[in-house]
Amino acid sequence: MPRPGRMTTERAKDFKGTLLQLVRTLGRYRLSLVTAIVFAILSTFFNIAGPKVLAKATTALATGWIAKLRGTGSIDFVYIGRILLFLLGMYLLSSAFSFIQGWLMTGLSQKVCYDFRRQINEKINRLPLAYFEKRTVGEVLSRITNDVDTLGQSLNQSITQLITSVTTMIGVLVMMLSISPKMTLIALLILPVSLALVLIVVRFSQKYFKAQQAILGVVNGQVEEVYSGHNVVKAFNREAVVLNDFNAANDKLYESAWKSQFLSGLMMPIMNFVGNLGYVAVAIVGSIFAANGIITIGDIQAFIQYVKNFTQPIQQLSQVSNMLQSMAAAAERVFEFLNEPEEDQQADPARRADPACIDGQVTFSHVRFGYTPDKTVIHDFSCEVKPGQKVAIVGPTGAGKTTMVKLLMRFYDVDSGSITLNGHDVRDFDRSALREGFGMVLQDTWLFKGTIMENIRYGRLDATDEEVIAAAKAANADHFIRTLPGGYQMELNEDASNVSQGQKQLLTIARTILADNRILILDEATSSVDTRTEQRIQTAMDRLMEGRTSFVIAHRLSTIRDADLILVMRDGDIVEQGTHDQLIEVGGFYADLYNSQFEDVVE
């Protein structure tokens, strides 16, 4: 089992570029976004106007109280009551607009998450196999779960707070200037200090937010890998090793998350301290102005409240900066995934071949291929396969057997040479049309959560129940299926662990039989089953392969002695080819392989 935990190298992040790309993405939701912004501004406007209206009530109360003490008048409670009722209406409208804005932004953020998940899921189907072979499953899943969730949550909160904070700052500034420009100047002295502190913290914390998102994908990959292979871990007593690997990755996640959250957490205490200094200065100067009759008591009360309201959006902007960093880190990982190079799904229209012409004739002509430019796996592979032939590809591990199948199905394209089907290069077929011509039974069986009937029908979705049952009978699977609880309607769990490995193999063969493809590929199809089950499988496969071109890849040479053609591969080249009897008679590399497995039979 490979040791998990190796982190892929992250290229430099583009914070501004990611935000611009995200803004362009939000363009399709402009109506909801603009409406939410309008309601956010309206809600903020009524909140801003509140202290100024309340100032009139405060002034009327103070003036009336002084007049009452002097015996020259009384408190006008009717006037004050009307002001308070008007103020209550303003705050109710503000709350209603805030509720509508929140409802719109929640819907918008969820739509964005929905669309990103859909795009990622569609993208997965268009990515080349090489992408997944270089990454862990958990890392890919992290894009569609953690990154998209982080993006949606940050988007929902950051846009609203950003608009509200900016609107509040502008509105409060206007109201403060209308009360006292001198006191406003004193209050504004805290702004450059606050802004400088925010920029410093953002600069130092951004790299840790990026690292946090990256290592989170690695941790997910480890958890997924260990969970899927927990039987192997326990069998080899590797719990301690796995735990150490996980702890190493978890320590990195803890370190990056702690630093990012600690630095971002410094913003609020610092901002509160700076804001309180400004608040004290304004209170002292305002008291002096009020004592000298420059401004009214109500205006002092309103101004002090505005100062508090002015520092609050600055603090909110510091929180928004944290959310924007987290959102940008997640969004860039999503955009990186969506911008990955895709397979060419469509062939050149000028040369496009009709998949109906595929009848099983396959020609490999001087094929050369390497997974990387500096390491060639297939050097010079040539072979002619006639329709209906059973072709066995044998050789030691690393000889290139499975690679040839990947090239045949265009999971990869050859570096040089060609592979043709009935004279047409495989690159002249649309990928989906080409792959519909192949049926595969892999060594690693894949069954999804669902009924046995649904799993077999996956080979041909429009198949009737009778056709599914017929395919199961042909694969010698009908008997054991009927003995299971529920029969064909039995529900397989997530990893199909409620059936045996041999039964899984029979179900995948039944699925391939149902697909009824012209070319069949068997990759170690019977290597994980007992002898009796293997005999049943072999009987079913012999019936299936009649009239179809079949490629059989196996180390167990007993399964391919009746092959029409055996290709013996070694170090990426065909070193021998012929029937079983011919190759045994030659006494070459194939004979050595065979004798090493069946020495008692040869003797």
Predicted segment positions?
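Transmembrane helices of ABC transporter permease
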Residues: 28, 32-45, 157-211, 282-295, ...
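Juxtamembrane loop-to-helix connectors within ABC transporter transmembrane domains
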Residues: 17-18, 26, 105, 125-170, ...
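Hydrophobic alpha-helical transmembrane bundles that constitute the permease/transmembrane domains
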Residues: 41-49, 91-99, 151-154, 158-170, ...
